[in-house]
């Protein structure tokens, strides 16, 4: 859940989880919306979407809809639409070998480059759906540089409007490795999570922001910075939303009691 906790989402935003099944990250993002805004959860696998649907329903995320589509088709309908996008990309799964021996059994030397090709296409489509000023978080559960630092280095070269954003770290977090890609020092802003450094599996995470345009001057950079520094904490706005909902619920209950008493 590190990926979902690092993406700063607030009520009223449009959020896309592009590779969402089975739904743990999607439901975490939906909870941050507090019933306001929109969550779009997509997965290309029809069988995995069933698990995604179940988890969305169980968690009661009302402002959401599910898709079972390739990213390119979604991008045709949602150009520059989303405030926040999460891409937990399909990968070679090297970080899961300890947890899932089957992942180690099916691994081959050809898998990382094959996955990297697919990841580039997914990321390209995700960037096209991201609003100027919006944020995208990319993650994998593999150690392979081809799928991690080299993907982000490619993004920085091919999409100059994208820039890496540093994330708040925890014990066990390690910096990205520029030496495993093109040497760009910006790659240190990525995060590697090693299973022998903390309790968990191997992961890679990178948070990026799309350059703003003059039309977006009403959204202050300070707001983005505040979100980043407190990505896993509830804001005062969240508390206000909960208080308003609680007050409205109490009002409806009182009205119902009066109707019973005098009706």
Q: Residue spans of the language-model regions?
A:
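S-adenosylmethionine
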Residues: 1-263
